[in-house]
Amino acid sequence: MTNELLIEIGTEELPAGVINPALDYLKDKINSLLNARQVKTYGTPRRLTLYFKDFENERKEKKEVIWGPPKNVAYDEKGNPTKALEGFLKKNNASLEEVKVLKKDKGEYVAIVRKVIEKSPIEKLQEEFEEILLSVPFPKRMRWTSSKRITFSRPVRWILALFNGQVLKLRFGELESSNKTYGHRFLSKGEVTINNPADYEKTLKEHYVIPDFNERKEIILRALEKSSQEVGGKPSYPEGLVEEVTNLVEYPFPVLGKFDEKYLELPPLVITTVAAHHQRFFCFEKDGKLLNYFLGISNNKPNEKIKEGYEKVLRARLEDALFFYREDLKKDLKSLIPELKKVLFHPKVGSMYEKEERMEKIAQKLCPLLKCEWEKVKEAVWLSKVDLLTEMVKELDELQGYMGYVYAKAQGYDEEVAKALWEQYFPRSLEDKVPETTTGTILSLSDKIDNLYSFFKAGEIPKGSSDPYGLRRSAFGIIKIVDVKNLDLNLEDFKEIYGEFKQYPKLVEFLKQRLISYLEDYPVDIVRAVLNVYSPMEPYKVINSVRVLYEASKSPEFPSVVEAAKRVIRIIPKDWKNYEVDEKLLSEEAERELYQKLTEFENKELKSPLELLPLKEYIDKFFDNVKVMAEDEKIRNNRISLLKRVENLFRTFGDFNEIVIKEG
């Protein structure tokens, strides 16, 4: 079990975003063959490295059963082999002595049982290595040889493979593995030999490559901390920038630069976005205001020339941004609204102007629920997409919403209206905040509801991992808003705006799957129980009911409630629809008592299924003393309807038939 394997796939510079996902995929795929106890990955822009230790590599013996024809086909009435059996033996190069008669579900069959020696895990890897590399799910793949078959995210230039200190022969196209790697593109010359996996990190560091992602990240974070102290502020940069920059360099060198204070006229988020978007620079702030400093991370040893180059390129970007900003401020946002008729939302859905028309109808339905000021909401709806026509957003589309807020505020629009223009895109993820203002909440919901309805009606439905229009994000955004804001919203109310369309059931199922994902921390049976009763189009009811049912499930009394509910459910025909109970037909005392108790509970506002526990006594008494399936059809149907009413009471909280009670 002391076997160890090191594989390094050397490439041209990989996009930062593909490195970690590719390593995760390769790790899982290769370790499914090796089953190693220790696994470690390393990744830089020029290499994907995997290390496996402590795995078995024996060739294992196993029995292989080759099934033949049924016994009565293989032998005649006298027990002699038939032509069918002879053909089976010839095909498998076997003798009559090897034949066994074994039982299957459909009777007795002849079979040949042989001992087979399986390939070792390493042999399997050698056999499957090329296919594994070809199966890595990159967003885009490229070819660099005459072979149309060999593709990867970027050209593969070398493969290092060591198994227990010896070169392991692996192939990818015409490329063969060796014990050679390469150091830093600029700071190291020629091949680097690795003879022992234990020397891998140390040797690469000597050649200006830090293969460990976390170590490079820590160097960048320390550089940010040191630079913050130097400039007297703290770092200010978009989420994910540290991780992205970490995968852009093999050896991080910090470069602290400065820009002209005149650019601080720009809104802070514009500066940090320009710096991060174009150059992957980090900015700094103090007391909520940006400082005119930035930190760049170079993949080469820093000098004054590199610093000046960084400052020059950022200055050019900020100069452009300042020009766009000043030009945009000259245009009243309202004057841009008619221009939205020329901005296509989607060929099958219409223009942005048409989208705002639909959003206004949605907002009108939402307004009473949130007690909004309609004039504010209406103004926000019609201003919501105009910043798409500004020069700043054309250049940096990630600033949409924010620039609407900035320009609206600068032009004297109502503060809540201005803020709503930014909040319409909240939350951008499940971790992101929801809108604070009422107007922003309505605008955000209107935008996301329209996205779902419009694209599903157009047949533009997410498939697999593909979601080009961010519909999963829209759905999660709606779910989180109604959850955080406690909005008892029925999304089906907006269907009339879009009319009938055949994809509507797919929209309902789509929301159901998003709710299941949102509620993944809760037991599956409880989530399923609620979704069997409440429509996914009522996300607040679903979420609230799951939480109520889950809290109740912690009680020692909960199994008794479930038992009572299931006892009722089991006896009711699945297609039973009648809830009407004729009191005159209740001839037994136990059924009269159950009916009386039932009506008491039906008139209560129940907050927990545990409140139904007292009903169990009457349910048990009913089943012990009353014959449900009475010979008289009217009496029988009346009793079933009574039980249907009882079941319906339990269904206030979910379908108890789905609840699994764990013993002990």
Curated annotation (Swiss-Prot):
GO biological process per UniProt: arginyl-tRNA aminoacylation; glycyl-tRNA aminoacylation
Compartments reported by the entry: Cytoplasm
Enzyme class: ligase
One Pfam assignment: tRNA_synt_2f
Signal peptide from the UniProt entry: none
Catalytic activity field: tRNA(Gly) + glycine + ATP = glycyl-tRNA(Gly) + AMP + diphosphate
Highest taxon above the source species: Bacteria
MF GO annotations: arginine-tRNA ligase activity; ATP binding; glycine-tRNA ligase activity
UniProt keyword annotations, A-Z: Aminoacyl-tRNA synthetase, ATP-binding, Cytoplasm, Ligase, Nucleotide-binding, Protein biosynthesis
InterPro entries, sorted: DALR_anticod-bd, Gly-tRNA-synth_bsu, Gly-tRNA-synth_heterodimer
Gene Ontology cellular component list: cytosol
EC number from the UniProt entry: 6.1.1.14
Family membership noted in the UniProt record: Belongs to the class-II aminoacyl-tRNA synthetase family.
Description of how the protein assembles with itself and partners: Tetramer of two alpha and two beta subunits.
HAMAP family: Gly_tRNA_synth_beta
Name by which UniProt lists this protein: Glycine--tRNA ligase beta subunit
Gene: glyS
